[in-house]
Amino acid sequence: MDSMEAVWWGKFCVWGTNKHPPLSGFPAYGIYLLFSENIKAVYILSQICITVGFCFIYKLASLLLEQRKAVLSVMLLEGCVFYGFCSPEYNVNVMSLALWPAVAYFFYRAVTENTLCLWCLAAIACAANFLNKYTAAWQLLGCAGFLFFTPEGRKMLKSYRPYVALAVFLLLIFPHFYWLWQHDFMVIEYFSSRSGGVYGQEMPLWENVLHHLISPAEFLVSMLFYGAGTLALFFAFSRSLEPEEIDFGSRRFLFWLGLFPLLLVLAYGLISGSPVK
């Protein structure tokens, strides 16, 4: 159903929908036309997204680890449900599997090499990720956190290049926000329905507190379950590998773009009590 929905969005080539930003529909409709309007072709697009994501993960890992471990970092993801069982059906989540690693890769190269070209590529990747799904904001906040709260990031802010990248990012997402303004920000209604149910009802204080605790706990347990295969493979292989020395700047980068978005999601669930996915 998500695949058909994406094709339908792409057919009308608009800058927004009632649920998500518009980007996922464009390639879906494009490949649908390329294969003579065969809806099965959209499932090929899912695997293209997975492959692109693997490529960027390998390229990023190769900047931090030796080649053998960089390859292993990609292979371990085959144990994750999102890269296997959930991957055939094309939707915004599958496209995110390509775009999140792309943002991390280009942003890492931008802050380490500080060239205008790389900053612009990072901005384009960030805009594409946001125009695919609003939850990309968690990763964008991680990028901002790295720039403002680390020595490496603050050093970059003394250059004009990050500000050019910010301008490129805002320019790319402006049409979508203009569309939202024209349509009275109709996507808010979808968000409200997703966070409705018992979470939107009046309840005793103790029950309300319990819901606020359950929401992030359920999310964390589900993520551990979905990634159980990857974790098992990691512990199996890690015994035969020597520890890798990673500099403090790279460790801070991995925290802000790897762990920090997860902490934000958990904090959102804890504060709002709404289901997080």
Give, region by region, the residue ranges found by the protein language model.
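Transmembrane-helix motifs of polytopic, lipid-linked glycan transferases
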Residues: 44-65, 79, 102-106
